[in-house]
From Swiss-Prot:
It comes from Thermotoga neapolitana (strain ATCC 49049 / DSM 4359 / NBRC 107923 / NS-E). It catalyses: tRNA(Ser) + L-serine + ATP = L-seryl-tRNA(Ser) + AMP + diphosphate + H(+); tRNA(Sec) + L-serine + ATP = L-seryl-tRNA(Sec) + AMP + diphosphate + H(+). SUPFAM superfamilies: Class II aaRS and biotin synthetases, tRNA-binding arm. It is found in: Cytoplasm. This is Serine--tRNA ligase. GO terms for molecular function: ATP binding; serine-tRNA ligase activity. Its main location: cytoplasm. The gene is serS. NCBIfam families: serS. It is an enzyme of class 6 (ligase). Consists of two distinct domains, a catalytic core and a N-terminal extension that is involved in tRNA binding. Homodimer. The tRNA molecule binds across the dimer. Catalyzes the attachment of serine to tRNA(Ser). Is also able to aminoacylate tRNA(Sec) with serine, to form the misacylated tRNA L-seryl-tRNA(Sec), which will be further converted into selenocysteinyl-tRNA(Sec). Belongs to the class-II aminoacyl-tRNA synthetase family. Type-1 seryl-tRNA synthetase subfamily. It comes from the Bacteria.
């Protein structure tokens, strides 16, 4: 949630930021209208409360002086003012609710370093690592390799749960688990993250903090009886861990890592990546979250990206890093880098990690602050998040990039201690 003060002071700046995102700016005028009404009602309320207090003092004084009739007249006026206050309090509450709902629907302001563009075609490549492999045979897609071994089963997954689910057996199931453990070990032992085990079901207010609600409810799985949401990413519980808390600057940054399954309805992706494991309703991911200070958050974002890149480098998978343009930024993000791994089946780079600085957008929603060492002032933290990395897509990248002419796949050297085998099947 962006600061209402910014909208009041410089609405044109906010509108320009929304235009760069390709968003409608009418909501800013609506916010200013409701905000003006709310402030007017608040001013009137304060005046009436002050008047009621004066009446109470005067009633006591008049009673002391034995002026009962005058005191009774003031009491009646006080009752009338009390009714006005009650009515205005209800109106104030209603306007506050409307204002918050509107503010929750405004995306974050893109950072000045973000390239301006309308869609992903205008994202800017930052760097590449590794070279896509040149095959001297016709490589197979993962959706052909896995089923041919009898280790990847889309048909039975569909029988169990419908489309966009996968069942894996034997060595592929073990490879998935090996990747999770490998990623967690690198991030905790080498990068200094604290591993966290989090709930996979969260409250409505929790998932509002990270920005999925209220705008994207149709993309989430909801257990209606309990009004709990299945998490679309571990970012949700990790960021909200410190909601409503005051942290000390000496304890920042906090760096958390968590493995969870993630659940997404993919409501807006009909017809995209329909084959294989690239776009699933349920997938495994290792998530990285930083809680840091405004002064260092953009430097921390660069480190977060490097931490995610390390995984791909250790696995020997070619990738590139791109800076998302304004029109492709996520709702809560001020700046995002995508890491895209090379997939031979697409003859293209495909997203495997998205790393974002959300600035104080989530902190304002969740009232997450820290006490500055210099002056003791309470300030909103900045939050960062990134995939460290998507497990299923990493498995896919290994199968496709490490396949051999005989239809087998070599396991990357870094994973052999985790798998206990060097070749699949």
């Amino acid at each position: 949630m962006i600061d209402i003060k910014l909208i009041r002071q410089d609405p044109d700046f906010v509108k320009d930021a929304l235009k760069k995102r390709g968003e409608d700016t009418d909501i800013i005028d609506e916010i200013l209208k409701i905000d003006s009404e709310w402030r007017s009602v608040t001013t009137e309320l304060n005046e009436l409360r002050a008047k009621r207090n004066d009446i109470s003092k005067n009633v006591a004084k008049l009673k002391k002086e034995g002026k009962s009739s005058e005191a009774n007249a003031l009491i009646e006026e006080g009752k009338r003012i009390g009714e006005e206050i009650k009515s205005l309090e209800e109106k104030e509450k209603e306007l506050q609710s409307k204002l918050r709902d509107l503010l929750l629907r405004v995306p974050n302001i893109p950072h000045e370093s973000v390239p301006v563009g309308s869609d992903e075609s205008q994202n800017v490549e930052v760097r590449r690592w590794g070279e896509p492999r040149k095959f001297d045979f016709a490589p197979l897609a993962h959706w052909d390799l896995g089923p041919a071994w009898g280790l990847m089963d889309f048909d039975r997954a569909s029988k169990l749960s419908g489309s966009r689910f996968t069942v894996m057996y034997g060595k592929l199931a073990r490879l998935e688990r090996a990747l999770i453990n490998f990623m967690l070990d690198v991030h905790t032992r080498e990068h200094g993250y604290t591993e966290v085990w989090v709930p996979h079901l969260v409250k409505r207010e929790t998932i509002t903090i990270t920005g999925q609600l209220p705008k994207f409810e149709e993309e989430l799985y909801l257990t209606e009886k309990d009004d709990l949401f299945l998490i679309p990413t571990a970012e949700v519980p990790l960021v909200a861990l410190h909601s409503g808390e005051i942290l000390e600057e000496k304890d920042l940054p906090k760096k958390y890592v968590a493995y969870t399954p993630c659940y997404r309805r993919e409501a807006g992706s009909y017809g995209k990546d329909v084959r294989g494991m690239i776009r699933q309703h349920q997938f495994d991911k290792v998530e990285l979250v930083w809680i840091t200070t405004p002064e260092r958050s953009f430097d921390d974002l660069e480190q977060l990206v490097r931490d995610a890149e390390t995984i791909l480098q250790r696995l020997g998978l070619p990738y590139r890093v791109v800076s998302l343009c304004t029109g492709d930024l996520g709702f809560a993000s001020a700046k995002t880098y995508d890491i895209e791994v090379w997939l031979p089946s697409y003859n293209a780079y495909k997203e495997i990690s998205s790393c974002s600085n959300v600035t104080d957008f989530q902190a304002r929603r969740g009232n997450m602050r820290y006490r500055r060492r210099s002056d003791g002032k309470l300030t909103l933290v900045h939050t960062l998040n990134g995939s460290g990395i998507a497990v299923g897509r990493t498995l896919v990248a290994i199968l496709e990039n490490y396949q051999q002419p005989d239809g087998s796949v070599k396991v990357p050297e870094a994973l052999v201690p985790y798998t206990g085998f060097e070749v699949i099947p």
